[in-house]
Amino acid sequence: MAQKGQLSDDEKFLFVDKNFINSPVAQADWAAKRLVWVPSEKQGFEAASIKEEKGDEVVVELVENGKKVTVGKDDIQKMNPPKFSKVEDMAELTCLNEASVLHNLRERYFSGLIYTYSGLFCVVVNPYKHLPIYSEKIVDMYKGKKRHEMPPHIYAIADTAYRSMLQDREDQSILCTGESGAGKTENTKKVIQYLAVVASSHKGKKDTSITGELEKQLLQANPILEAFGNAKTVKNDNSSRFGKFIRINFDVTGYIVGANIETYLLEKSRAIRQARDERTFHIFYYMIAGAKEKMRSDLLLEGFNNYTFLSNGFVPIPAAQDDEMFQETVEAMAIMGFSEEEQLSILKVVSSVLQLGNIVFKKERNTDQASMPDNTAAQKVCHLMGINVTDFTRSILTPRIKVGRDVVQKAQTKEQADFAVEALAKATYERLFRWILTRVNKALDKTHRQGASFLGILDIAGFEIFEVNSFEQLCINYTNEKLQQLFNHTMFILEQEEYQREGIEWNFIDFGLDLQPCIELIERPNNPPGVLALLDEECWFPKATDKSFVEKLCTEQGSHPKFQKPKQLKDKTEFSIIHYAGKVDYNASAWLTKNMDPLNDNVTSLLNASSDKFVADLWKDVDRIVGLDQMAKMTESSLPSASKTKKGMFRTVGQLYKEQLGKLMTTLRNTTPNFVRCIIPNHEKRSGKLDAFLVLEQLRCNGVLEGIRICRQGFPNRIVFQEFRQRYEILAANAIPKGFMDGKQACILMIKALELDPNLYRIGQSKIFFRTGVLAHLEEERDLKITDVIMAFQAMCRGYLARKAFAKRQQQLTAMKVIQRNCAAYLKLRNWQWWRLFTKVKPLLQVTRQEEEMQAKEDELQKTKERQQKAENELKELEQKHSQLTEEKNLLQEQLQAETELYAEAEEMRVRLAAKKQELEEILHEMEARLEEEEDRGQQLQAERKKMAQQMLDLEEQLEEEEAARQKLQLEKVTAEAKIKKLEDEILVMDDQNNKLSKERKLLEERISDLTTNLAEEEEKAKNLTKLKNKHESMISELEVRLKKEEKSRQELEKLKRKLEGDASDFHEQIADLQAQIAELKMQLAKKEEELQAALARLDDEIAQKNNALKKIRELEGHISDLQEDLDSERAARNKAEKQKRDLGEELEALKTELEDTLDSTATQQELRAKREQEVTVLKKALDEETRSHEAQVQEMRQKHAQAVEELTEQLEQFKRAKANLDKNKQTLEKENADLAGELRVLGQAKQEVEHKKKKLEAQVQELQSKCSDGERARAELNDKVHKLQNEVESVTGMLNEAEGKAIKLAKDVASLSSQLQDTQELLQEETRQKLNVSTKLRQLEEERNSLQDQLDEEMEAKQNLERHISTLNIQLSDSKKKLQDFASTVEALEEGKKRFQKEIENLTQQYEEKAAAYDKLEKTKNRLQQELDDLVVDLDNQRQLVSNLEKKQRKFDQLLAEEKNISSKYADERDRAEAEAREKETKALSLARALEEALEAKEELERTNKMLKAEMEDLVSSKDDVGKNVHELEKSKRALETQMEEMKTQLEELEDELQATEDAKLRLEVNMQALKGQFERDLQARDEQNEEKRRQLQRQLHEYETELEDERKQRALAAAAKKKLEGDLKDLELQADSAIKGREEAIKQLRKLQAQMKDFQRELEDARASRDEIFATAKENEKKAKSLEADLMQLQEDLAAAERARKQADLEKEELAEELASSLSGRNALQDEKRRLEARIAQLEEELEEEQGNMEAMSDRVRKATQQAEQLSNELATERSTAQKNESARQQLERQNKELRSKLHEMEGAVKSKFKSTIAALEAKIAQLEEQVEQEAREKQAATKSLKQKDKKLKEILLQVEDERKMAEQYKEQAEKGNARVKQLKRQLEEAEEESQRINANRRKLQRELDEATESNEAMGREVNALKSKLRRGNETSFVPSRRSGGRRVIENADGSEEETDTRDADFNGTKASE
């Protein structure tokens, strides 16, 4: 990120100081000290340097205080190099661990950098102070920038979401999550602020009257909602006590068109009660502190301490003034459009809520009834709310309630009255809040423009753990659980699922962050029900309490892992839930009340009838059922997306909130989420302090580390092939050959051309995936490439424009010279008399003819005006008729609207009654079900009592059996003690032999613990026998009490049932009445519809007449416009002709004067004129022929071009059709490829499962071997068995050690060894179970005895006729007591043995703990090494990428050098060429200069001769008298001299012209030379500077590359050292593997002896494989058929979708027709045009309808084929089932053979056990392999049958879908037929529109032709005039010679006037001025 010198004050909180980070001193210090992170109790982690390594421990020196500490290797974490300090994206860290992440966040936080990227999301730490990073300047900095171009900021997140919404056309959401006080609300406000600036809807608009109104209101909505919904809590001074989802709608161009706010769960209980040091909602304090005196008197306000509902009085907020905030809130409401009356009404309601708290009730002396001794507060409440005081107090103290069908008054107690007032206050405030929200939404959504997409911002209460957590905290924490689960699912599950779906190489990583168990604990509906479901269930029962709810919750969810019962119970209403952020203790007191939210009906009806309109509006929709108040309408108005389901159902607060949350989660899942994780640094709300453990806990809970890890290891950026090719093909322009190419193949070629590292990307099925930062790098290169291309294009454009401007200047220069010459000629010509005469006479020639034409045109115009007036009168009449018809139509529509509204109200009432009836019926059914359950339970109790008598008879026998069992137990105890002593000795021996027998000790410990637990159980049972009798007696009494209660409840239920039946009959009668009313309304509606149809028919006739009239009017207007155009063209032609007439007249006058002057040369001049006229006519004819041929050629070229265009369009259509076919084929091939890939994956997984099960079976074979060898012996052979187990444990421990050595590379071996170890544990546990069977039987007998004793005691109290039997049992009990006393003595002995065993157990546990600690240490080392390996792999990838980037830069550098060399050589060549041209032009200039000098010399010589001749002529004239005789000769000589002089003049003029031209050329050459020289010098200088700059830049880059290479060498050296270490470990492992291989070879030698017996097994295996292959073949065929059926189904679905689209298009056309009909009332012309267009559309729709009918027939054929194929598949399934049964029989036969082989094997094992133990083990392994193969066959057979069942199911689903599609197609057909009638009406309109457009095009073409002809004729006239002028000039050259001759004397004698005239005429007709 570019830094611009010194950072400004606000940029210091955004940018990092790179000078400190890139310090080489810090880098060297880090490398020298070997810095690491070690755990710290204060700071979480502390920096230290490694001093010494001692095995598994490391001695480190703390950097802060220099203290040396010894820590474990597993506890230290690597430190990143200093260049990664304060890194902006933590995914760039080299060593990713908790310490590095915490350190980076801490460093940035202390530097004022609160935003940090963490992979794909952003982490924000609350600064607890104001930072200058939210100004308009910062907004402009982030506007339109990419993420990597600017530092982290909430503006960057908002801009990314905004740009993604516009580019991808996908809805976006920004989720700010975190604990309470972390800064979610503030960041939400910043997002809205940024969007209001960037996407302002008034940008670029001219209307400034509404500038930014919507944006202002959007920004001001937050202060209003915060004032009424936020409060101060312990953790946060501005805590949102409600959740909100702000949906900002944007149009297609990205402007804001509206917004909507949805709220969730306002904590309304805060309005009446607050915890210590907390406040209620802000508006209460704002109002009391900021209201003026008048307002205080109007609102009846008092001091803070005078209100009971303000529990803590006035609690100030630091840095906030309540009075100022009140003014801001009032201003915000004014901006939102709240009137002053509405504001005052709102504040009155707020004040009334406070006054409700001041109402005090007292208990009367003799009764519990409540009374109100002082009603002052009540009077204030009633004054503010507009209700009667007496009615209000009566409703509170003695409300009227309904008992059955009667209404009675019931006196309330003090507690009930207090509760009613508090409930009223809460409900009033909640309704006020919802009204404000509805009003705000109405203001924000008043534009009524359709939004193309939206951006949602979620701000919801954060996770809360208070001292007392109630129902609101449960809902808030439940919401946060759902949001965190969405984050985990989006970041971890969906990301990896897409990798697998695209088929890229990826191993699925389970991050263990599933929160579903906790969510199900709260929201699960049944089996078992969750917290909310149980709470709703308890709300049904009238006697339910909070304690019963908690008890039921503990019984249902007591075993749930996320549910806990607190150990130290303060109250019986407490329970705990383990959330993702920690354990929360909830107190369920008053939860039932909060969930039901009851209200007093009497008070709500009073408020509904209030005199205050605002209060009445708040309470207008009260609907109460079963004690719950309903606010359905208000909820719908505030939540536009909420559906109108179950208006009258029993709806609890929990249910409503759960549904709202479900809709919110659905909305979020449909958007692309952008996560912002807000972190709270400390709980003291202090800036500059960061609690490390608090931040770490939040990072762990939020999944920050896992998110960074998957961002680093995964491929977070992805792009589809077509978009990648379209966007980045400019970077590899020549890589893709011309012609069609598959998108994937093209991307592969582009990747090769771009030379990307293969580790940086993966190519999937439809997308290409990139690691972090790769796409950003490609974007930068693309921007640079586009910049270069644009610069080159701009240079070419500027060059072209400069050349064009230069040519234009040259043309202007020559034109200026011509104009100057002509102006000078005109100045001399204007005083010529003949010219003046010509200009006066010429305009008078055509005046008479033009006047006649003007008169005719005026007559025609008058007629046209009359016709237009007539048409206008007709149009006015038609408009009057139309207005009458529209009025009639409006009246009919109003009547129809009123009737439909009446019908809708009746329908709504019917629906509401039906819902109430349904609710009551459900309650009745539930009561009946409970009644039946109670009856069943009573019958069960009677049956149990009958069973007791029979069971009592068997009690004596069971007691005797128990005594025998006790004796057996004592014997077993003695034997067990002996065995335990032996085992103790053997354990000591084993400790001496090997110190790694921890596993066996664990097993022995479990065995001993089982024995001790059994002994303890026996002791407890012996003690409890004395208490059994009392217990059973109490149980019987409780059962009798419960039975009586059940009988009472049954009677109550019967009464309720009768009552409900009566209500149901009343409802039936009401429903019948309503149905009769509905029938009457329907009849009236039918009549009105008939009248409306008749009116519409009349309207159609009127419209047709109007259309005809409009058609005539349009024709007349067209005719008028044609005439007007003809008139204009005639006028223009007349003016043009007059102008031409004047010009020709002037020319004619000039010609006449010239002809008069040139009468001397008559014959020759006439001949020349005739010749010239003939030449002119010939030229005219040739010109006409040329124009005609040119027009013909143009016409032919147009026809050819049109034909070529048609051919190309046909070819294009063919190519499109071919492309569509290829796309379909490609899709089918891709589907087949995906299916094959899926099959391959399934087979691979099956193979892995088979291998895994093979290993398990091998372990089971070993287990069977040990069981077969050890199970046959008696328990006396325990010592031998222990020795065997010792050997096995030794082998296992050896394998474990080997696995620990291979921990880095052989993790799978560790898993297999642990599985083997688990098998041995299970084996030992099974043996202990066999030894303890007797004790379990004893426990069973005791349990049976207990149950019988219970039954006995119950019968003693229930029946008196069994007293004798009870006395005998008492005698038996006394005997049993004696026996128990005897047994107590044995128990004491057992206790002594127990103490001894406990000591042994303690020793064993100590040894076990040591072994477990060693194992944990090994696990830690393994994990640490694995993390180091992962870091090394990441470093290696980074280094590879760095090397590849360096190589690419080197290649680019070489390429740039080569280009620079080429450019410099090219410029050198250009310079040489320019110098050569300059030299040539200089030589030409010199030669021209010499020629000019020669011409000047010749001119001077001619002038001298001329002067001499003049002198001679003067002499001759003067001597005329003397030589009169020689006059004739003198005249001849004079004429000769004059001709010579004339020739000399012409030569002189020609020489002067040439001289002028050479001078001009010389000047141009000099100017061009100077310009070229200057440009060349500037280019050379710029090129030198550019080369110098590039050289310096390249030197800097080389220096940077050298430093980077040096770093890379160091890192490579470290990697090489690690590699050497790993290679050493590998060599050790290879040595161990060699020893294992030698042992394996020895086993193989012994195995070869028994290979003959294996051949039989192999044959059977081959048979089984053949049968399996047959099954697979048949299954594949079935799958192919199913795929073909699926393809047919897909085709049918596509056809159906096409029909659906056609239907939707028809609907759209229908709506457009309706709109056009409405618009026809104002403009008839548009309706006529639209009519013709729509008629053509109707024809097209008819054709599409016919095509759809054909498609439907084809679809029915396909359905028939599908049914036939389904029957065929069912037959094949039957055959497959038969083959499967055969395979099953074969498998059973193989299993029997396998059992026989096992028995043979056991026999062989008994025979040769002592000698060939190893060979038997090998045989058993082989047998296990065969068993595994057999089981594999069985599994494959099961998979085949499963796949067949799946195919069956798919086939049925396909048939059902086909049937549904057939029905839908029929519906579409009916809709299309209905649309035909409307569609035919539109066909005529489109034809008329086409005729109109053709006529307009014809007129346009006609005018274009006339214009072309006029311009051609004008050009021809101009050419003719020029030709005449040139002829006239040539004629004057000869005609003026005599005049000069005759005027020669005048030239000599007279003054200079005549000479000037001659010169003027010469200049005029020759074009150049002769001067003497």
UniProtKB/Swiss-Prot annotation:
The keyword Transmembrane helix does not apply. GO terms for cellular component: cytoplasm; cytosol; extracellular exosome; melanosome; muscle myosin complex; myosin filament; myosin II complex. Keywords: Actin-binding, Aortic aneurysm, ATP-binding, Calmodulin-binding, Chromosomal rearrangement, Coiled coil, Disease variant, Methylation, Motor protein, Muscle protein, Myosin, Nucleotide-binding, Phosphoprotein, Proto-oncogene, Thick filament. Residues 786-815 form the IQ domain. Residues 1935-1972 are annotated as: C-terminal. The modification Phosphothreonine is found at residues 1177, 1958. Residues 1762-1788 have a biased composition (Polar residues). Residues 1789-1800, 1866-1876 have a biased composition (Basic and acidic residues). Smooth muscle; expressed in the umbilical artery, bladder, esophagus and trachea. Isoform 1 is mostly found in slowly contracting tonic muscles. ATP binds at residues 178-185. Residues 844-1934 form a coiled coil. InterPro entries: IQ_motif_EF-hand-BS, Kinesin_motor_dom_sf, Myosin_head_motor_dom-like, Myosin_N, Myosin_S1_N, Myosin_tail, P-loop_NTPase. It comes from the Eukaryota. It holds the Pfam family Myosin_N. The modification Phosphoserine is found at residues 8, 23, 40, 1684, 1722, 1954, 1971. One of its GO terms (molecular function) is actin filament binding. Transmembrane segments: none annotated. GO terms for biological process: actomyosin structure organization; cardiac muscle cell development; elastic fiber assembly; skeletal muscle myosin thick filament assembly; smooth muscle contraction. Residues 31-81 form the Myosin N-terminal SH3-like domain. It is found in: Melanosome. Residues 858-882, 1744-1800, 1866-1972 are annotated as: Disordered. Muscle myosin is a hexameric protein that consists of 2 heavy chain subunits (MHC), 2 alkali light chain subunits (MLC) and 2 regulatory light chain subunits (MLC-2). The rodlike tail sequence is highly repetitive, showing cycles of a 28-residue repeat pattern composed of 4 heptapeptides, characteristic for alpha-helical coiled coils. Limited proteolysis of myosin heavy chain produces 1 light meromyosin (LMM) and 1 heavy meromyosin (HMM). HMM can be further cleaved into 2 globular subfragments (S1) and 1 rod-shaped subfragment (S2). Belongs to the TRAFAC class myosin-kinesin ATPase superfamily. Myosin family. Muscle contraction. This is Myosin-11. It comes from Homo sapiens.
